[in-house]
């Protein structure tokens, strides 16, 4: 792959990620309440879903998913409902528990939250299927180029998520008492906001 094309691709991905989305908001919430090391399992779940979506795009499944409007709608709204449930649950736990006493979520739970939040946007398959061909040279082998584009995207996304998580974890360590209690509530609100963003995307795509 031409280096200039790769640099253009990197710039494009950076622009696309410049605005926080549902996965970034979830990472903020989980890293603030569970710490960065555990929060990274949320990022791992998100990246796992992204990888599967990329593979689906590379294998030519984009057209199938794009034509299955019912499947898209069901997956999206299940993801929305799941995030709302998590957000409300965290807000209620913050209200009844003493600050800092709430048990941390398991690594498996954090991974699953990240995975479901990303997988709730199955049109990502269509997005990757539309994005990658812009930077693939038809005269070269497809899969090596696909691997480079996929690895680059996952690396950039992982760095963004880690930066969000590190910032939230740093802030959480410096807040105590009532301030920490409000941080937990804000974290729950971030999850609900992530659900709202997913819902708005679904409604916008449906119109």
Regions from the PLM with identified roles:
Residues 21, 121, 188:
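Short, conserved phosphate/pyrophosphate- and ester-handling motifs at nucleotide-, phospho-/glycolipid
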Residues 114, 119-123:
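Selected transmembrane alpha-helices and immediately adjacent juxtamembrane segments
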Residues 92-109:
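Flexible cytoplasmic inter-helical loops of multi-pass small-molecule transporters
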Residues 10, 110-114:
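C-terminal ligand-sensing/allosteric alpha-helical core of TetR-family HTH transcriptional regulators
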Residues 67-95, 154-164, 168, 175-207:
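Selective transmembrane alpha-helices of multi-pass membrane proteins
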Residues 1-4, 205-207:
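Short, strongly hydrophobic alpha-helical membrane anchors
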Residues 3-73, 128-154, 165-173:
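Juxtamembrane transmembrane-helix termini in multi-pass membrane transport proteins
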